[in-house]
Amino acid sequence: MYNPKNKTSANSKGGESVESARMFNIINKLRFLMISCRIEARLSLDEACKLIQVDKKKSAHFFADSILRTLDEALGKPLVLRLPGEKSYSFDEKWLARLITSFRNKDHINIKFLLNSRVENLNKRSYIYFLIEGLSQDIDSL
């Protein structure tokens, strides 16, 4: 699993720096996307998932945009993302990085733990699961 504190992956031995650089790039792209999301209208989790259901071949960019525009609702508080390029991670970014890594590793126990620890509402939890899973399936195109 990805550890943002020391930027390593516990599952890899030789590719730790590659995985940490890869996750930093993903989080940094999400930071850039968040800047544009702030000027767009808020979107409910329900609306975001319905839009994706119309075209299930949506890109990772669309999933990421939907996540960033709805995560405030799911968490019950504003999402904290640092400015693009910053080396330190916010608590929300660490949580998101761990969640993405867990999806990529198909670590369902950790996925459940991470979602249960931050998203109280069961319906919202399932929406976030759907969105993060969609993002992680095509994350390299982000």
Residue ranges of model-derived segments:
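C-terminal-biased regions
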Residues: M1-L142
